[in-house]
Amino acid sequence: MSRDLIKKYCVCVEGVYVKKNKILLMKRCVIPFKGFWHLVGGQVEKNETLKEALKREFKEETNLDVKVGDVVGGRIEETFDRTKIIVTFEVVGAQGEINLNDENSEYGWFAKIPRNSVYDFGKFLQR
């Protein structure tokens, strides 16, 4: 696989964590999507499985140790410089207290998805 192809595509993961019919969302404080709500997630690193990547991202962004369940969705996002292949997993449990890193300014549990969201996560509340 050429380096150009690797630069044009990246695989990302995100986690849907629903508790008491509310979904956990984070508010970005850095570009891209500064000021927008999103699911916890990020890019898969070399030699990492998709589930390992999501566990790492949850730990980095929230300080939570999570149990990752099944794939519940996915999508492709085209940006100006690459294509993101995003795999969405259900998070079926978590331990610890939420402590944000420097990528997010706040978190919230939502029964309705805020208008300023990166993506419409509402379908995950209807499960």
Question: PLM features: what roles do these ranges have?
Answer:
Residues 44, 93-94, 98, 112:
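Hydrophobic pocket-lining residues within nucleotide cofactor-binding pockets
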